[in-house]
């Protein structure tokens, strides 16, 4: 990394150290990052951080799985078998590595006052869903459909027993949502592959959901590096 960029990065980005790496699902690793600069941040459930993964200009975005105000956050990073800088960083990050990352950001966040909460997405969405679900009290009304490649790809989500788990290749996610038929009046959080997100949004709109009550986040699309 060019030395001239370091002062700029110190102003724009936070610094932390990887303190734990754990295989969390068949294709996800959980990274714990700690540092004084991470203490006391304003973090909303569902937000994300941009991480430097190679050169000073190469960043990838990851949802925050868990945040501790004392100065620690956890990311769950998916190994998608690619060979780009983000995929390599996700596979190779190790305890002791320094990490530079931006402050948590994004508007795809929990609406805690909603009458009920509907979660629809795939593995890439389930990390943000995990933070949102963990922030909901036990009595919250929760439903949804989460798609994974195998049962071993399922994250340990709070309220998981109230979700319909869909194996990829069995029932298309939009069809699963149609079968679930969540009643309008709450908030729907829809994230994952871009075309699927759009299709699910149409299913909900056709079922009477107000567009303002359907929060969407296309995390990826085939053949594209990212949609941030």
What are these regions (language model features)?
Residues 1-7:
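Short boundary/loop segments of OB/S1/cold-shock single-stranded nucleic-acid-binding domains
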Residues 35, 53, 77-79, 103-105, ...:
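Short, structured patches in soluble enzyme cores that scaffold and shape functional sites
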Residues 85-154, 186, 190:
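Active-site beta-strand/loop microenvironment that shapes enzyme catalytic pockets
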Residues 36, 61, 107, 195-197, ...:
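Hydrophobic N-terminal alpha-helices or hydrophobic patches in metabolic proteins across all domains
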Residues 37, 136, 204-208:
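Active-site catalytic pocket residues across diverse enzymes, especially alpha/beta-hydrolases
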Residues 145-228:
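Reductase modules of NAD(P)H-dependent flavoproteins
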Residues 8-92:
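Ferredoxin-reductase
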